[in-house]
Amino acid sequence: MKIVVLAGGISTERDVSLVTGKNVYNALCTKGHQVILLDVYLGYEGEVQNIFEQDIDWIAQVGSISEESPDLEAVKAMRKDGDKNFFGPNVLTICQESDVVFMALHGECGEDGKIQAAFDLFGIRYTGTDPTSSAICMDKAITKDLFKAYGISTPKGVHFTKENPIMEPVALPCVVKACCGGSSVGVTIANTKEEYQTAVKDTFRYGDKIVVEQYIKGREFSVGVIDGRALPVIEIAPLCGFYDYKNKYQAGSTVETCPAEIPQEATEGMQKCAEEAYRALRLKNYARMDFMMDAEGKYYCLEANTLPGMTSTSLLPQEAAAVGISFEDLCQKIVDMAV
């Protein structure tokens, strides 16, 4: 098949997306496909005729993930055409020539449904879920509201906008999150009123809406779901702090155990909850649900990831490997579900 792996963009998760794209590109090449790795924002300014037959080093632009989120203004300055269009030069043209686009994007303008909606209008096939469910899952406030409506256990919380902020914490400690952020960018644990107020001000740098929820002290887990079926539970134990941007993507920053060493009842309960969340949010193809478990063994579903990371340290590939699915086969399975 002719496959475009679409990565990059201008979200705070740009670097992660590029490394996901590189890994997926290599895996699909191994499977014998004609594959292009394309930055959705920077595009490709060369000759596009017979683009899939050209001998181009598509991964030359991809580097390692830094400990901090990327300088997006510097990325925007790299755009030679100066166009305000989100899609870089020839992106839509190249995607229309493909059999399917593998969505290796993360964060805003990737996981939020906007690109999916554009692709639907252009008749372009893509991996992952549809525009509506993508947009819902990108908004943590709406996701939590749906979890509550479907009886899915989730931490208590409130959400508010920059126009009407809640500057007095409802309860402490609490977690302050950018409503539409990802990779734990814009996430702070506040233990005091002063920390809370500082966190609210800082988090508004990442968007106009914030979610504040009760802090669940305990163990962190994740459960991938492929085509409605849960994978093994994985436990994530950061060596320092919580599972933030640095701990997620710097090798050696966390200890991950899959299958998680927890009672079978807890494993089955979390897997069932992940599948229920998948159905409640109307997800398609694949996703990953994040959980916390308190000292009493009660688990809470935090959020859904519609385009989980596929880097060397990412959780979904580790979960798939635990049931004998190689990274290459996982990528192929995701493609097969989309076509």
Q: What label would you give each PLM region?
A:
Residues 1-132, 136-138, 142, 149, ...:
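ATP-binding N-terminal substructure of ATP-dependent carboxylate-amine bond-forming enzymes
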Residues 3-7, 11, 15, 19, ...:
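Active-site nucleotide/adenylate-binding loops and adjacent lid/helix of ATP-dependent enzymes
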Residues 330-339:
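Cysteine/selenocysteine-centered motifs that mediate thiol-based redox chemistry or coordinate metal-sulfur cofactors
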Residues 214, 223-225, 278-310, 320:
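Conserved metal-phosphate-binding beta-hairpin within the catalytic cores
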Residues 35, 125-126, 154, 174, ...:
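Hydrophobic beta-strand scaffold residues
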Residues 191-272, 293-300:
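Phosphate-binding site of ATP-dependent enzymes
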Residues 107, 184, 239, 305-319:
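Glycine-rich phosphate/pyrophosphate-binding beta-alpha loops
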